[in-house]
């Protein structure tokens, strides 16, 4: 007997096909990415970050849009993959591809670990400040007037030892 629990949102069509959820397929364990995808469609946080990042890549060699790279990285972090070493495996995951906007079965693989790592290390200090400003702007557009919002920012100093990149 199948248990059909209604979802709290409608699933969009994917590659002109109706999307259904089945917990017996054993294709991916990243079902929460459907929620993340819908939130991104509603809020556009990853799109805003991608637009704030300068793209210094050679236009003739670009295979992945900046938004796709940012969204793939955010999706990986949301699934518990904080560092980038799992991204070469995740780039073929059907739900990761779906979260980024690619066809799960037939769409091209997502950006590789090295591509995403280059993106993470590319911003200069002024560009990092622009990314922070984009997040603050995003926060400002989502706050409802008259509500109390608390930003809990951890300012704990964490010393980095050795010659670590971007260490103080």
Where in this protein do the model-derived segments appear?
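Dynamic "connector" segments at or just before major functional cores
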Residues: 1-168
